[in-house]
Regions:
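Hydrophobic faces of well-ordered beta-strands that scaffold small-molecule active sites
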Residues: 1-5, 27-29, 46
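Active-site-proximal loop/turn and secondary-structure-junction residues that shape catalytic pockets
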Residues: 5-11, 31-35
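Catalytic cores of alpha/beta
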Residues: 9-22, 41
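Secondary-structure transition/capping motifs at alpha-helix termini
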Residues: 20-27, 53-57
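Glycine-rich phosphate-binding active-site loops on the catalytic face of alpha/beta enzymes
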Residues: 22-39
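Conserved, mostly hydrophobic/aromatic
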Residues: 23, 46, 146
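C-terminal helical cap(s) of enzyme catalytic domains, especially alpha/beta-barrels
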Residues: 35-63
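A mid-to-C-terminal "edge-of-domain" accessory segment
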Residues: 56-191
């Protein structure tokens, strides 16, 4: 028995799981759900759910690369907010989320850090949790960003970046933050 589902009502993955539960031998799916009308069952989402349910045990760390390849080959873009392989799938600029991830990392608990605010562990699909700085960020976001970029965490630098983030209506990009860093970092000639 084969099952072939579409995304007309957004239930491709759920219906595929139910089909397998009911005894289907095979379910059809496509990378990033590419298919007629609104698409077929998204293979990437199906595989991740099968893995998380313990129904399969596969190395999914190249799934993102595969979906990027499918996107380029077909000309179908991956939306930024697409689950698992979208640009924003593992990004957060929210203070409470970042604080929990950072706290787990500081305790050496990478397993928890990868799951505390994500229903899918980023490492399972070859990705990483990314902490950004924006208007909903906390001080810990700024400290983490500086640390991740090898920049010493100094109070005046943290305060300046944090203030700029709070005045913004969006996530700050790396260039904006680096500009603030360079503006507040003494040059070698001034020392």
């Amino acid at each position: 028995i084969d099952w072939h589902g579409h995304q007309d009502r957004g239930f491709g993955v759920q219906n595929s799981l139910w089909a397998l539960e009911a005894g289907a031998h095979r379910v059809h799916a496509c990378a990033i759900g590419i298919g007629e009308r609104v698409g077929n069952t998204p293979m990437d989402q199906l595989l991740v759910n099968l893995q998380l349910l313990g129904w399969i045990d596969r190395d999914l760390t190249k799934l993102h690369e595969y979906c990027e390849l499918a996107s380029r080959a077909t000309g179908v873009p991956i939306p930024d907010n697409y689950p698992i392989v979208g640009r924003d799938a593992f990004r957060t600029g929210t203070g409470v989320h970042a604080a929990a991830i950072i706290k787990a990392r500081k305790k050496g608990d990478d397993w928890l850090a990868d799951r505390v605010y994500s229903g899918v562990p980023a490492s399972m699909v070859g990705r990483k949790q990314i902490i950004e700085v924006g208007p909903m960020s906390g001080i810990s976001n700024v400290q983490c960003w500086l640390d991740n970029h090898g920049i010493p965490v100094r109070p005046e630098l943290v305060d300046a970046i944090f203030q700029r983030a709070k005045e913004s209506d969006r996530i700050l990009n790396d260039e904006e933050i680096l500009s603030l860093v360079h503006g507040l970092t003494p040059t070698a000639a001034a020392r």
